[in-house]
């Protein structure tokens, strides 16, 4: 078996030995978190599989030791591969497939997608099963040393470009920076768009995919995105750019630029339009692209006069990214047009569709006079093999570009200060929120078709909150395997629209809506933490008692109840600590209640009864979820005691729904239950971890169990101190 050794020249090479010498194993390497990569020519390697598959280009290989500190959300990357499930061909290596934004690896900035992991601390993971690699990473502790291999990036050509600002400014857009990586694992500032007619376009040397190293004398390597924005804004008419030109071979391993960039033109270009991305909800930033994304074909190489104008028949096979194009139009019979082709997607790979095509039909469904929604539904429901009749109509499409530009201006004008030409910098970039309402983008009258639908309780990572109406955000998944990125309505937009709705609803009444604005809920800021106990369970709403009883009887090893306290005398058959904790005096229990040692307490027949924090903690630390029959007020008291509960509200859809779920109660009882639930939701929505609904108790109970499973931890989201 080939093994990894280290010789005195600080080069790694493979030798024909069964095991590496002990003195050269990774455990005995110097613990230098920032040690430079070690370079070795591929002619010293005897493992062609690595030479062909790892990140970079053929030629030289580099090895790097990267030390990461495990964060609240883990190490912040995903892996694939292993002897039982090779990621590329027959190569058993463990590959990095994703760098999670905001995670430990992304913040460190050195680990890259397609890096091959050789060792985790002292554990050799070069030829192990996938589960063994996962276990090695899980058991590595809080400080993890990774030994990775990649191809050495090709040498970049460095040039200096002199630009003179014109009416359209510098005329290009950028993305990237520390904490806002354009390419996972790379903090560089990249050019993502050249604006036609701008200074960069007229000069002709700056291209999409170029890396900006410096502006005048200001370096842009390893800087925040906002710093790059400021450096480009604070320039005079003559600007000198230091630019690195990447090679095509390296670009093939890169990732497509995100849809939202910062534009340096007096006419903002923020890729916000009334269009539908007809693929998955993944952003283009997370989709592998072909080199042509960074090397756009010049228009004069394929003149518009060479493109046929008659209707064409195109067959596209839906891929994992959907069909891979956006559409606009559908108002007043104006037609449906393609506005964007996703690089590397099915439409792009077919080579048959282009921006400016009008879609006449989909699988025989006539779309010539269809609305935008009708066209989107037709394309979504078209199946795996989609037959499209399209006709190239650039003149008609140009009308949409003008309309889109006007919409952008209207949106941006609401969030830009006078005299500025770029998105206003906002200090609240990169924070996490929990949604306190359901949002269905199809019911929003706004024009952002790339909006992101979500449900109550979903955690969202806000990537960019610089616009006052729409925030760019990523839905956070517990498995960190997939990302849904899009636009969500800002807190201001949500609350303004809800306030307008309430005002319209109460218009003409004597009391009006005075004082209701404070009750409008949108989002709450959250932070992630690790817990080492089983979270208490509080179920609220109709049928909560039945759900509690079923959990205790069906899963006695996972759920338990705590022993309450009381001041009443112990009866002969009762045992202290089993039936109740009998408190010796009323004064003592009252003092403990005032000291917030109880999450809930009350009086019955002149005796005090209550549930103490310590009783709940004892059950939780035994690894059982403590089922609590308490009011919603107990949620905040448990949070204050650092025992963060899972609070589930069973929301009845209607009075009839209450009767259907519980057929044993009368209509009057159902009405009271429905009214109590309505009031409970109005007063305590922000305390709920999740809201469940159902047409039967069985459906509700199934959803309750799933919520508990999803929110059990060990990593959970809790309210943060910061306010939006």
From Swiss-Prot:
Boundaries of every SH3 domain copy: 428-498
Family note: Belongs to the MAGUK family.
GO function term, MF aspect, one: scaffold protein binding
Intracellular or extracellular location(s): Cell membrane; Postsynaptic density; Synapse; Cytoplasm
Domain of life, source organism: Eukaryota
Keyword terms: Cell membrane, Cell projection, Cytoplasm, Lipoprotein, Membrane, Palmitate, Phosphoprotein, Repeat, SH3 domain, Synapse, Ubl conjugation
InterPro entries associated with the record: DLG1-4_PDZ_assoc, DLG1-like, DLG1_PEST_dom, GK/Ca_channel_bsu, Guanylate_kin-like_dom, Guanylate_kinase_CS, P-loop_NTPase, PDZ
Membrane topology of the entry: Lipid-anchor
Protein purpose: Postsynaptic scaffolding protein that plays a critical role in synaptogenesis and synaptic plasticity by providing a platform for the postsynaptic clustering of crucial synaptic proteins. Interacts with the cytoplasmic tail of NMDA receptor subunits and shaker-type potassium channels. Required for synaptic plasticity associated with NMDA receptor signaling. Overexpression or depletion of DLG4 changes the ratio of excitatory to inhibitory synapses in hippocampal neurons. May reduce the amplitude of ASIC3 acid-evoked currents by retaining the channel intracellularly.
Domain notes: The PDZ domain 3 mediates interaction with ADR1B.
Annotated spans, Disordered: 15-35
Disruption phenotype: Mice with a stop codon in the third PDZ domain have impaired spatial learning. NMDA-mediated synaptic plasticity is lost even though receptor levels and localization are unchanged. Long-term potentiation of synaptic transmission is enhanced due to minimal long-term depression.
Residue stretches making up the PDZ domain: 65-151, 160-246, 313-393
Quaternary state and interactors: Interacts through its PDZ domains with ANO2 and NETO1. Interacts with KCNJ4. Interacts through its first two PDZ domains with GRIN2A, GRIN2B, GRIN2C, GRIN2D. Interacts with ERBB4. Interacts with KCNA1, KCNA2, KCNA3 and KCNA4. Interacts with SYNGAP1. Interacts with ASIC3. Interacts with CXADR. Interacts with KCND2. Interacts with SEMA4C. Interacts with LRRC4 and LRRC4B. Interacts through its first PDZ domain with GRIK2 and CRIPT. Interacts through its second PDZ domain with the PDZ domain of NOS1 or the C-terminus of CAPON.
GO-annotated cellular components: AMPA glutamate receptor complex; cell junction; cell periphery; cerebellar mossy fiber; cortical cytoskeleton; cytoplasm; dendrite; dendrite cytoplasm
Protein name according to UniProt: Disks large homolog 4
Residues in Guanylate kinase-like domain copies: 534-709
UniProt cross-references to CDD domains, sorted A to Z: GMPK, PDZ1_Dlg1-2-4-like, PDZ2_Dlg1-2-4-like, PDZ3_Dlg1-2-4-like, SH3_DLG4
Residues recorded as bearing Phosphoserine in the entry: 73, 142, 295, 415, 418, 422, 425, 449, 480, 606, 654
GO biological process, one term: regulation of neuronal synaptic plasticity
Modification type Phosphothreonine: residues: 420
Modification(s) after translation: Palmitoylated. Palmitoylation is required for targeting to postsynaptic density, plasma membrane and synapses. Palmitoylation by ZDHHC2 occurs when the synaptic activity decreases and induces DLG4 synaptic clustering. Palmitoylation by ZDHHC15 regulates trafficking to the postsynaptic density and function in synaptogenesis. Palmitoylation may play a role in glutamate receptor GRIA1 synapse clustering. Depalmitoylated by ABHD17A and ABHD17B and to a lesser extent by ABHD17C, ABHD12, ABHD13, LYPLA1 and LYPLA2. Ubiquitinated by MDM2 in response to NMDA receptor activation, leading to proteasome-mediated degradation of DLG4 which is required for AMPA receptor endocytosis.
Tissue and organ expression note: Expressed in the outer plexiform layer of the retina of the eye (at protein level). Highly expressed in CA1 stratum oriens and stratum radiatum hippocampal neurons. Expressed in the striatum and in the cortex.
Modification Phosphotyrosine, positions: 240, 580, 715
